[in-house]
Structures are given as structure tokens and as C-alpha cells.
């Protein structure tokens, strides 16, 4: 899969007889699911939403307006591009797209602790999954650790400098 693609939904079961399918949103932007929105599968095939019911989270895709055709979509993963995501999903001040945070250095007091490799959501907040820098691993620190994405630990995020400034993240690493 092209690194410019972002997973946004999984198509669930068929609903009714006219080809509607349940959409399981995998992101933070349900507003991207609307009439004429374009998505892709892992092979780059296009899927265009013909209609979307916000309350039921069901979609009808162009060319799949029949239950037998729609059944072929069940369990298909839908993707969009980073470019379309930036265009269609508006962020509030201080918010970032997950794909922009991946790969940023975790820095504390000028020391690079590691690199963000993944982001996991728990019920209350996101957790940054960090691969510890080789220098720290070589002196006995854990290979990976988590940093809660909350003000207590994250001071600032700079996409320009490719870093997240933290406080007390090293304490988490030391106790991992």
C-alpha cells in the first residue's frame, strides 16, 4: 500500500436490500463520509459514496446499488489520500493528523529519546508508541515505551522541526 494512503474505514455487513453497507469509521473525521466522497481499496480501486446516512453510519456506493453487489464489499478496508484528508478534514488549533505525528522525534531537554512509531487510542487519550533511540538502548534502556499524549507529558509539537518536546517522558522510559 502506498504510504500516501490512510486507512479510514472498514466496510461492514449489508443493511437492507438496496446495497447499503455499514461503515466502521477508523478515524476522527466522520464528516469525510458524504455524497460523492472518493475512497480507495488496497489495490487503488475507487469507491464513490452515492449516499450516506449519518445516524445509521451506512453508505451506498456507486455501482453497488444491489445487495448481491454490495456483499462483495464486506470487510473491505477503505483508504483515502493524505492530500484528500488535509483538504476534507479541518483541524482545530493544536491538533495534528496521526500520519504527521508518526516519525517525529521525542525530545526532552535536548536529548532525543526516540521516534514515534505508532499511536494507540485508549479510552481517555492517545498513547505515542516510541522506539527508543539506539544510543539509549545500548546503555540498557527499554527498546520501546509509551508516552501519553496529554499536557502533563507533551509540551509542544513541531512538524517543521520534526519533534515533540516532552517533560517526564524520560522517567517513563527509565521505568519501562
Swiss-Prot record:
Single Gene Ontology BP annotation: rRNA processing
Subcellular location: Cytoplasm
Record keywords: Chaperone, Cytoplasm, Ribosome biogenesis, rRNA processing
Domain (PRC barrel) ranges: 93-172
Matches recorded under InterPro entries: PRC_barrel-like_sf (IPR011033), PRC_RimM (IPR056792), RimM (IPR011961), RimM_N (IPR002676), RimM_N_sf (IPR036976), Transl_B-barrel_sf (IPR009000)
UniProt GO molecular function: ribosome binding
Domain of life: Bacteria
One cellular-component annotation, GO: ribosome
Family per similarity comment: Belongs to the RimM family.
HAMAP family to which the protein is assigned, alphabetical: Ribosome_mat_RimM
Record note on domains: The PRC barrel domain binds ribosomal protein uS19.
Subunit structure: Binds ribosomal protein uS19.
Protein known as: Ribosome maturation factor RimM
Native source organism of the sequence: Campylobacter curvus (strain 525.92)
Organism classification: Bacteria, Pseudomonadati, Campylobacterota, Epsilonproteobacteria, Campylobacterales
Primary gene name: rimM
Amino acid at each position: 500500500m502506498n504510504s500516501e494512503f490512510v486507512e479510514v474505514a472498514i466496510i461492514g455487513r449489508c443493511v437492507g436490500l438496496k446495497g447499503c453497507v455499514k461503515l466502521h469509521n477508523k478515524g476522527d473525521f466522520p464528516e469525510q463520509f458524504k455524497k460523492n466522497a472518493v475512497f480507495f481499496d488496497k489495490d487503488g480501486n475507487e469507491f464513490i459514496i452515492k449516499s450516506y446516512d449519518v445516524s445509521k453510519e451506512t453508505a451506498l456506493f456507486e455501482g453497488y446499488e444491489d445487495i448481491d453487489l454490495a456483499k462483495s464489499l464486506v470487510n473491505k478496508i477503505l483508504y483515502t489520500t493524505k492530500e484528500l484528508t488535509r483538504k476534507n478534514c479541518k483541524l482545530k488549533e493544536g491538533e495534528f493528523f496521526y500520519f504527521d505525528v508518526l516519525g517525529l522525534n521525542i525530545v526532552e531537554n535536548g536529548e532525543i529519546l526516540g521516534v514515534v512509531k505508532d499511536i494507540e487510542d485508549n479510552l481517555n487519550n492517545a498513547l505515542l508508541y516510541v522506539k527508543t533511540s539506539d544510543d539509549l538502548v545500548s546503555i540498557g534502556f527499554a527498546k520501546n515505551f509509551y508516552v501519553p499524549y496529554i499536557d502533563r507529558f507533551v509540551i509542544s509539537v513541531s512538524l517543521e522541526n520534526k519533534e515533540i518536546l516532552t517533560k517526564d517522558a524520560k522517567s517513563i522510559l527509565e521505568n519501562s
